[in-house]
Amino acid sequence: MKKQNLVEMEGTITESLPNAMFRVCLDNGCYVLAHISGKIRRNYIRILIGDRVKVELSPYDLSKGRITYRLRIKSINDSNDLIK
């Protein structure tokens, strides 16, 4: 169940840390320390440096968050198909 008072932002993984922790650069330029949510961990979704992710932040501590979704990166072939 999703909580109402969370702040959700998008960002890019910049560093992989031990214990499934990651440093994420948000779109506004801030860096946060984020861990993987249970659904991502349970479904063995790989998160690598450079991936775009959605991060939930608590309004009480904006320096820590939880990665809830890995965004799909459009490949070059997909963009060429759209042009034709």
From Swiss-Prot:
Gene3D superfamilies: Nucleic acid-binding proteins (2.40.50.140). Residues 1-72 form the S1-like domain. It holds the Pfam family eIF-1a. Keywords: Chloroplast, Initiation factor, Plastid, Protein biosynthesis, RNA-binding, rRNA-binding. GO terms for cellular component: chloroplast; cytosol. InterPro entries: NA-bd_OB-fold (IPR012340), RNA-binding_domain_S1_IF1 (IPR006196), S1_domain (IPR003029), TIF_IF1 (IPR004368). It comes from the Eukaryota. GO terms for molecular function: ribosome binding; rRNA binding; translation initiation factor activity. Its main location: plastid. It is found in: Plastid, Chloroplast. Component of the 30S ribosomal translation pre-initiation complex which assembles on the 30S ribosome in the order IF-2 and IF-3, IF-1 and N-formylmethionyl-tRNA(fMet); mRNA recruitment can occur at any time during PIC assembly. Belongs to the IF-1 family. One of the essential components for the initiation of protein synthesis. Stabilizes the binding of IF-2 and IF-3 on the 30S subunit to which N-formylmethionyl-tRNA(fMet) subsequently binds. Helps modulate mRNA selection, yielding the 30S pre-initiation complex (PIC). Upon addition of the 50S ribosomal subunit IF-1, IF-2 and IF-3 are released leaving the mature 70S translation initiation complex. This is Translation initiation factor IF-1, chloroplastic. It comes from Spirogyra maxima (Green alga).
